[in-house]
Amino acid sequence: MASFAQWISGARPRTLPNAVAPVVAGTGTAAWLHSAVWWKALLALVVAVALVIGVNYANDYSDGIRGTDDHRAGPMRLVGSRLAFPRSVLTAAVVGLTVSTVAGLALALLSAPWLIMVGATCIAGAWLYTGSSKPYGYKGFGEVAVFVFFGLVAVLGTEYTQALRVDWVGLVLAVSTGALSSSVLVANNLRDIHTDTQSHKFTLAVRLGDAHTRQLYQALLVATGVLTVVLMVATSWCAVGLVATPLALRAMRPVRSGRMGPDLTPVLRDTGLAMVVWAIAVAGALTLAGSVTY
C-alpha cells in the first residue's frame, strides 16, 4: 500500500501555487484598498489549499478507475499505479473538499453570505472536472475552469471578503493570475497530449494540437507580463512583478524548443514558481503602496 510520502506526492504539492498565488494577489489588492484582514486571508488560503488537494485526489480517483492514468508521463498516481484502493483515494478527496467547504462557509458567513453560492459552484466544479459521467476536463474546458475558479473567483473573492468591494486593480490581478494558473494546466496537458489522445481524453491540448498548444502557453505568460505593466498605472511599484520574468523565460524554454513528454515536467514546476514569485512581488508592491488594516 502507499506510504505516507506517496500520499503526499499524490496530493501533487507542486500544484499548490494555484492555491497560494490568487490568495496572495487578492490580499494585496485588499491592502491597496486599505482593507486587508489577515485572518480572513489565512482562512481563504485554507479554502484554496484544501480545494486544490481535494481536486487532485478526486482526479487521481476518477482518472484511475477509468484507466486514463495507466501510462501517464507525469507524477505518480495512487489509483493508476495500484498503490492505494480507489475508495481510500476517494475518501481523501472528500476530506479535502469538506475542509474547503467548512472553511469557505465560515469565510462567507463572516463576510458576505451570498458567497456561499459561489463556493458551492467551486466545489461542484472541482468534482465535475473529472468526476462526472461526462467530465468537462475531458472535453477541453479544463483551462477555462482554472481561469475562472483560480483566477477570477479566487482573487476577487479574496479581495471582496476583506474589502467588501472589488476594483479594476483586482480585476487585472484576477485575469493575470487566471492566465498563469491556466498556463500550468496547458503545460501539463501538452506533456500528456499523446497519452491523453490514446485514452480519448480530449483536453484543450489534444483539440488544439501540439504547435498551437505551445503558442497558447507562451501567449498566457506574455499576457501576464503585459498586464503587469498595466498595473503600473495604479502604482509604479508594481514593476517589481517583472522580477518573475527570468523564471517565466526559463519555463518557456523547453516549450519553445519542442521538448515532449516527461521532458516538459520541469515546465510545470517553473511556471508555478514564476506564478508565486509574481504574486508575492505584486501583492507586496500594492501593500507597501497602501496602508494595511490590522
Curated annotation (Swiss-Prot):
Q: Which reaction does it catalyse?
A: an all-trans-polyprenyl diphosphate + 1,4-dihydroxy-2-naphthoate + H(+) = a 2-demethylmenaquinol + CO2 + diphosphate
> EC number(s) of the enzyme?
2.5.1.74
Location in the cell reads: Cell membrane
First-level EC class: transferase
Topology in the lipid bilayer? Multi-pass membrane protein
Q: State the InterPro entries in the record.
A: MenA (IPR004657), UbiA_prenyltransferase (IPR000537), UBIAD1 (IPR026046)
Q: Which Pfam families match?
A: UbiA
What name is this protein filed under?
1,4-dihydroxy-2-naphthoate octaprenyltransferase
Q: Which organism is this protein's natural source?
A: Mycobacterium leprae (strain TN)
